[in-house]
Amino acid sequence: MRFFRGRKVELETLVFNFRKAIETAKDNDEPGEFFRKFPVGQCGNTSDILAQYLIDNEIGPITYVNGTYYGDDLEDRWAHTWLVVNGLVIDITGDQFKYHKRPLAYDIPVYIGPMTEFYRLFEVSPGGRCEHYGLEKQWIHYHELKDWYEVILKYLR
């Protein structure tokens, strides 16, 4: 796998096209909870599938990051997942927070850039950050993720 360095334009093209393919699949009523709910509650699945796509396009290494936002109220707790490539945050589901109140309100559908205050809101435990090597067959949801990935690829061709 080649290391991403100075190819932000290529990375942006891949990522924006991937998000567009998911939106098109959703608009075409592709089956599955992933497409029905996207982007709400799909940041983990999306990050896994996007990581596989980037790996397939020889972009890496990729870090998977999962954090939790803790509000003042005990019930005010939200998880979010994104990827990091060469120090750049890659998030194509941030707009799932567009109806939340500040400080969690966020309406950017595709973000590629440095860490921002929004991402700093999420507490990342040591186990919440790991290298991503693509979809792995031993994962409990592997077949679902793989099926969704194949549908998305259909819209990228």
Regions found by a protein language model. Give the residues of each.
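A structural boundary/capping signal
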Residues: 1-157
